[in-house]
């Protein structure tokens, strides 16, 4: 929840149906190049608006207070001077503002318009329905500018928008890394802040995975408290932010032990004898699936939909579709028994690799994924199988049910089966792969491919992106959801996208932050160093100026993005300094110093984020440094330097070169991270360079 939101006393004036005649017939604003002052604005919202519209209005007020340092003084809207902000058609009408017909707007569509009125300006926001008004307020927040302690929007304002995609969802999936990077380490306040960040990007679907698969039943008091927290987060997203929440779960993986770890946030997974896949054809095992579901739905009973992925985690080798349907029917019965009166959540199938397909082993033997799935999949047989799945659901499942298309080829069969309106497209990895070493991703091509493919299917319900480490992936995430709102944004050049993002994060530091993002792939160590010194000064001073619509919501503190950029740029600078030096004639000692410095920066970040745990549990048994043609050339040059004039470089010389730095680095970092992540693959690359 935003830092000062929720304090009603100084925030708003509730519209009470003031006659339009008392509003002195507002006229549309026409003068360009002027400002509409918001520092002392009165915000008006009708008390009959839904809770999420009321909350959005409070959030707007809190943001203005944050910029100006001034509480929104309560004043009657009919007599107040200065700018008045009307939230919703009823509030606008109370100020004499009429929008005309809004029926042409699509779902979540809105109008933001400024009017001139005797005594001050009126800035009105309204949607075709409350959800549109809610998204309109999120958009207004993006338009707000600060000049010192003065808040304003550029005038005139006349925006009429509808989204390209009605459903714009985000899914988090990742690993047990350190706080605040990995979502599994988040607590309730962090989850709510994430929901706020999503709302600020006009995301309207939150696809949440609570990891019921690691909670054995009967639930411990700690596990039950954790699920109660999930329930409250769902409630917050839906009631206070107007989002839909979908809950993810495996169809047949259950927790059988807590692995000796009481806190589910740090409980290991996937670990044999801690979690198991159940065979739905075995009555006893099917009963255990139902017991797990029942305990889950009894607490987390307030979501809009429940999604079962067809595999990974879960699935059963060669299990027929009838077994998947039996699981869905059991889930339907149990969900309906626990859901609030008058509601019927949707059941959704995440079409991943297909129920009963591609597993090598008997699932009772191991919960570690092992699939005969290659870069040639999904092939024609996989797509055909998804068609069979859809037809089976049509014939055997009660409504409402839906689909997530998890692979681009599945969209064709979804269209053929005429269920595009039931389907959200989740091109997993378009924003960020997982598992993947923690790094901010740049580049737009993967996102453009998503919307190129999705654009071929008129009637598709929506699109979804995924994050492994949300706090690192603002560039691509921002680009993805700006494009989901309006696909014309796909044509915006990356430097301009980063400027747009930086304005939403740190408006007073817009150019610095955008340049820092771009520097993550800069080849010039000196140029990176110049930016680093400015970031260090910003971080050390602790004040980046008034936060933007996104920046105000960052956690664990307002400078999180600055700090993450600084640490990643230190890695990049060290890498490029080594590469640049290898193009000259450095001494062996200089080369050793540069390599050790590069590894030290990498390993510091590796430890900061908690990726060292991934190496320790062998999920990531490979290098953590960034490969590339420039590094390959540098390694060959290093091999020549280590020869010290000899016609060739034997292994002994290379091994000896790394010896002292191994000792130094192992004194600071764990052995696996040093040796598996850095030394051994780097050494081998030098040996094999030619």
Spell out what each predicted region is.
Residues 64, 129, 198, 308, ...:
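Conserved, mostly hydrophobic/aromatic
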Residues 95, 133-136, 180-181, 413, ...:
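Short helix/loop capping segments that flank catalytic or ligand/cofactor-binding pockets
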Residues 1-5:
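Positively charged n-region of N-terminal signal peptides that target proteins for export
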Residues 489-690:
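Catalytic domains of carbohydrate-active enzymes that cleave complex glycans
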Residues 72, 147-149, 173, 204-206, ...:
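Catalytic-core regions of glycoside hydrolase
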Residues 6-17:
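Bacterial N-terminal signal peptides
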Residues 21-116, 150-156:
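Acidic, contiguous N-terminal accessory segments
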Residues 56-59, 63, 103-284, 427:
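Feature activates predominantly on carbohydrate-active enzymes
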């Amino acid at each position: 929840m935003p830092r000062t939101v929720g304090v009603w006393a100084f925030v708003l004036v509730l519209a009470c149906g003031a006659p339009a005649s008392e509003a002195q017939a507002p006229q549309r604003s026409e003068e360009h190049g002027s400002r509409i002052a918001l520092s002392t604005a009165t915000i008006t919202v009708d008390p009959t608006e839904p809770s999420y519209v009321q909350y959005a209005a409070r959030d707007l007020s809190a943001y203005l207070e944050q910029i100006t340092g001034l509480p929104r003084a309560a004043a009657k809207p009919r007599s107040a001077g200065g700018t008045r902000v009307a939230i919703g058609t009823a509030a606008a009408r109370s100020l004499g503002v009429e929008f005309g017909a809004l029926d042409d707007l699509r779902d979540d569509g809105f109008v933001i318009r400024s009017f001139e009125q005797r005594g001050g300006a009126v800035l009105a926001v309204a949607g075709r329905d409350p959800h549109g008004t809610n998204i309109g307020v999120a958009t207004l927040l993006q338009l707000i500018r600060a000049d010192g302690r003065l808040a304003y929007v550029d005038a005139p304002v006349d925006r009429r928008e509808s989204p390209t995609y009605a459903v714009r969802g985000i899914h988090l999936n990742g690993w047990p890394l350190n706080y605040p990077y990995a979502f599994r380490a988040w607590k309730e306040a962090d989850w709510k802040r994430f929901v706020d960040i999503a709302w600020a990007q006009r995301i309207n679907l939150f696809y949440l995975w609570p990891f019921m698969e690691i909670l054995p039943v009967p639930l411990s008091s700690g596990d039950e408290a954790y699920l109660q927290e999930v329930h409250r987060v769902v409630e917050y997203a839906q009631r206070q932010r107007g989002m839909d929440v979908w809950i993810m779960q495996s169809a047949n993986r259950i927790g059988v032990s807590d692995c000796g770890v009481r806190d589910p946030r740090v409980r290991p997974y996937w670990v044999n004898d801690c979690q198991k896949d159940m065979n739905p054809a075995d009555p006893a095992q099917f009963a255990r699936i139902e017991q797990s579901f029942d305990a889950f739905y009894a607490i987390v009973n307030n979501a809009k939909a429940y999604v079962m992925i067809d595999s990974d985690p879960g699935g059963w080798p060669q299990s027929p579709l009838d077994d998947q349907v039996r699981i869905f029917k059991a889930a339907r019965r149990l969900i309906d028994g626990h859901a609030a009166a008058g509601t019927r959540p949707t059941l959704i199938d995440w079409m991943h690799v297909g129920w009963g397909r591609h597993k090598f082993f008997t699932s009772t033997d191991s919960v570690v994924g092992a699939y005969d799935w290659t870069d040639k999949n999904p092939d024609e047989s996989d797509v055909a199988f998804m068609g069979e799945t859809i037809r089976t659901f049509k014939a055997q499942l009660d409504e409402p049910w839906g689909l997530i298309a998890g692979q681009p080829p599945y969209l064709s069969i979804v269209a053929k089966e005429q269920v595009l309106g039931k389907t959200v497209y989740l091109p997993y990895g378009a924003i960020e792969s997982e598992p993947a070493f923690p790094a901010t991703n740049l580049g737009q091509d993967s996102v453009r491919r998503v919307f190129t493919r999705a654009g071929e299917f008129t009637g598709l319900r929506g699109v979804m992106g995924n994050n492994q480490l949300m706090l690192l992936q603002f560039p691509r995430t921002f680009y993805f959801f700006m494009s989901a709102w309006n696909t014309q944004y796909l044509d915006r050049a990356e430097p301009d996208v980063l400027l747009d993002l930086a304005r939403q994060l740190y408006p007073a530091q817009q150019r610095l932050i955008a340049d820092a993002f771009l520097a993550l792939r800069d080849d010039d160590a000196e140029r990176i160093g110049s930016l680093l010194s400015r970031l260090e000064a910003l971080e050390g001073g602790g004040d980046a100026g008034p936060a933007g619509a996104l920046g105000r919501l960052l956690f664990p503190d307002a400078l999180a993005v600055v700090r993450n950029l600084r640490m990643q740029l230190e890695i990049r600078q060290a890498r490029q300094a080594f590469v640049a030096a290898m193009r000259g004639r450095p001494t062996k000692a200089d080369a050793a110093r540069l390599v050790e410095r590069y590894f030290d920066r990498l390993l510091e970040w590796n430890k900061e984020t908690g990726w060292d745990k991934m190496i320790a549990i062998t999920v990531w048994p490979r290098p953590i440094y960034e490969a590339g043609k420039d590094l390959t050339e540098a390694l060959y040059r290093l091999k020549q330097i280590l020869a010290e004039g000899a016609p060739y470089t034997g292994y002994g010389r290379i091994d000896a070169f790394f010896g002292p730095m191994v000792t130094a680095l192992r004194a600071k970092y764990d052995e696996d991270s040093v040796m598996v992540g850095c030394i051994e693959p780097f050494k081998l690359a030098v040996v094999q360079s030619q």
